Amino acid sequence: MALRKPTDDENALLDLMIARADAFTPSAADRTGLSVETMNDGGMGSLRLFPPGTRGKSRVFGRRVSDWAFDDLDGVQVTVALVVDANDRLYELELWKSDFGRLLRLPELPAK
């Protein structure tokens, strides 16, 4: 998949997840220079996150820093997790729809 800038809706969800994070605050450079890549998750909406300077580098899962859930348009619950790598840099925004279906829409959240 190709790298791209996050959409406004993805940015709003990232902002919410960062605000809910336990003992984690990304650097301003990591947040403003962030690129994303859609993960091959069957259309559930998960993103691999690439702060500046991380593309092409070996990175590993560090920890989950926040969780949240919302209902998709069809009423099916979607669980969201923000994950950082072992160096505490943004790593993945994981979305999991409980029926394994495709995400219909990200939640409507106010943009910053």
PLM regions with names:
Residues 71-112:
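Short, compact, well-ordered microdomains
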Residues 1-67, 104-112:
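N-terminal domain-onset segments
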